[in-house]
Amino acid sequence: MLTIISYFGFLFGALTLALILFIGLNKIQLI
């Protein structure tokens, strides 16, 4: 059970980080 929670936490963190990087690159291209 604990491993499943940690796995989903890691997956959510990775998706959030990717989204932040994607938005950051788009803002750099807009400037």
UniProtKB/Swiss-Prot annotation:
The gene is petL. The lineage of its organism: Eukaryota, Viridiplantae, Streptophyta, Embryophyta, Bryophyta. It is found in: Plastid, Chloroplast thylakoid membrane. Belongs to the PetL family. GO terms for cellular component: chloroplast thylakoid membrane; cytochrome b6f complex. Its main location: plastid. One of its GO terms (molecular function) is electron transporter, transferring electrons within cytochrome b6/f complex of photosystem II activity. This is Cytochrome b6-f complex subunit 6. The chain crosses the membrane at residues 4-24. One of its GO terms (biological process) is photosynthesis.
